[in-house]
């Protein structure tokens, strides 16, 4: 779903069930993951990972999109798994490559986790990372 006056530059990839709010602008070659939500008036200059909400100027990851996941039919167990993966990726003191390996080790690679990790590994513009204090509060 794309709201009024949202703008996508060239070669942007938008995943299934993603939402882009009004007046949001997405830079060329960015990827918006499946079941992600970009808040209104956000300036997206890096990839928005699957299953997250991004907001701000520039956009940063705010929280796992729990409501969107529920609406898309994800089970509560899958949502817990996704939240755990994001905690490993962004709240531990690990380099991203180490955190990806840790997710694979601790959680495995269900379809949802594989979608997340694939998005990280193929990112060309970098990731719209979380503001750590806010993200820890919202993912914990």
Residue positions per predicted region:
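Terminal amphipathic alpha-helical/low-complexity segments used for targeting or macromolecular assembly
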Residues: 51, 57-140
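Left-handed beta-helix
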Residues: 2-10, 15-16, 20-28, 33-34, ...
């Amino acid at each position: 779903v794309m709201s009024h006056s949202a703008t996508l530059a060239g070669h942007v990839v938008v995943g299934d069930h993603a939402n882009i709010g009004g007046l949001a602008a997405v830079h060329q070659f960015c990827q918006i993951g499946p079941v992600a939500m970009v808040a209104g008036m956000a300036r997206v200059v890096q990839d928005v990972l699957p299953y997250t909400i991004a907001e701000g100027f520039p956009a940063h990851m705010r929280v796992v999109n729990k409501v969107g996941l529920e609406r898309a039919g994800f089970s509560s167990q899958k949502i817990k798994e996704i939240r755990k993966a994001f905690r490993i990726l962004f709240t531990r003191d690990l380099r991203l490559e180490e955190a990806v390996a840790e997710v694979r080790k601790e959680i495995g690679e269900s379809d949802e986790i594989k979608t997340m990790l694939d998005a990280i590994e193929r990112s060309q513009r970098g990731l719209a990372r979380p503001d750590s204090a806010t993200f820890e509060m919202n993912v914990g």
